[in-house]
Each structure stands twice: as structure tokens, then as C-alpha cells.
Amino acid sequence: MATTEHRPTERVLDILELLSNSESGMTLTELSKALEAPKSSIMPLVHTMRSRNFIYMQSETLRYFIGVATYTVGISYNNHQTSLQFIKQEMEKISSICDETCQLGIQSRNMILYIAKVESSQPIRLISSVGKQLPLYCTSLGRALLAYKSDDEIRNMFPSTLKSYTSNTVTNIDSLLKELVATRERGYAMEREETNHLINCIAVSLNYHNNPIAAISVSIPTFRLNEQKIQETVNVLFEAKRNIESHFKTFGVDFGNLD
């Protein structure tokens, strides 16, 4: 493995990463091979890590595994940073970069429930409130979640005729299904003035174990919307999605208080 900093420290971290990704553990020989380092240089590190309970050795097989001290450190981090707090930090970044309002929503039956938002500093921006609910079918947040459902599931969720909120609202199931096909192909959902006049939204789902559990969106007034703005926003959302889903994978999902 390539080294860029203090070599012994890097090897300690490399050992932790290797063992954390190995359900069957690793022998000293396997660690030596993976690290491209002699056993003589690894053994002192392993001995210290064992004595501090960051790793342990199974005496019958001589294989090393992640130890309880590693769990203690990890749970300490998780206790101080819930999933929602981490998402909120990413939303702050999104709003700062895009200078637009960013919202987080979860599914509540056939509605999207807004559970967090970060306001834009722009004088003209979307005005919304946490706790508000809107139909899944006409919001980008909702469509980002609906895209993971089958056509039959969608048809069973909604009536054939859908309520209109503006002249742009999708008002029938077939049109909604076409929009969801486009959402799957793009990797993000879009809504153009379907719930609010002159407001457009772009959203991506946040997945845990390959299931969408929430979605984040950016709301953009029509007069600030163009193809460049869309692409820049999508790129920022994709980066946040990767960061958040990586957090989910490492720490699980804990939608605790945002305070």
C-alpha cells in the first residue's frame, strides 16, 4: 500500500481497515502480504493493538479480528453525530455552494414529509416549513423515492386522475410513470413549477441497504434556472448523496434530534 504520511501510523490504520472488511479475519502472513511489508515490521504494531484491545487474535486459528476498543471509538462518534445531524451538515454545504434552499423529506404514506431544511441567502427563494406535507407524485423529493417502485405499485398508490396544484402539475398516472422512467435514467428527480409557481426542484434519494429512506432536494426559482445551474446542482447533490450513504453504511441510520 502506498504511504503518504507517517509509515507506522499508516500501517496501524491500514490494519484496522483490512480487518474491518474481513469477516473471517486475517493471519499475520495475510496482513504482511496485503500491506506489502515484512512480518517483522508488522508484529510490534499488532502486539500493541492487541494489548489495547483494538484487535484480537483467535488462538485456535491465529487469525486477527477487529477488537472491542474499535467499537467503543466508533460508537462514541455515532453518539455525538446522529444521521440527521450529518445530513444537515451536508445540506449546509449544498445550500452554500448552490446558494439555494435545500430540503430533506421522507415518505409518509402517499405524501412527502419535510423534516429539515436549510434556507438560501437569496432574497427571492422558496418559502417552506418543516412538517409540511405534499403528494409524492408532484414533488422531486417524492419522485426520487417513487422511482424505486414498480409501475403496479405506483398505480395502486394513486388514483388515475391526480390533483393539480399548478398548470404544470402531472395529473395522470401514465404521465407520472413516464417521468419516473426519466428519473431512473438520469439518477435524479426533477419538478418544474408543479407545486409552486416559478419554483423548480431537483432531488436525489438517500439509500440504506439499497432502499430509499429519504431524499434531499434543491429548490431553484425559474429565473435562476438554466442547464448549467441544473448540472451544477446535480453534481453537488450526487456528492452529498455519496457522503451521506457512506455515513449510513458505516454507522447505520439514526434519525435523532437535529438540535
What are these regions, as identified by a protein language model?
Residues 1-78, 85, 245:
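N-terminal helix-turn-helix
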Residues 5-9, 28, 63, 67, ...:
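Short, structured helix-loop boundary elements
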Residues 18, 34, 86-97, 186, ...:
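Amphipathic alpha-helical regulatory segments at dimerization interfaces
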Residues 20, 142, 146, 150, ...:
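Short amphipathic alpha-helical signal-transduction/dimerization elements
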Residues 55-57, 104-105, 206:
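A structural signal for short hydrophobic beta-strand segments in well-ordered beta-sheet cores
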Residues 61, 65-160:
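Amphipathic alpha-helical effector-binding/dimerization core
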Residues 168-243, 258:
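Extended hydrophobic
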Residues 250-259:
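Short, highly charged C-terminal tails/helix-capping segments
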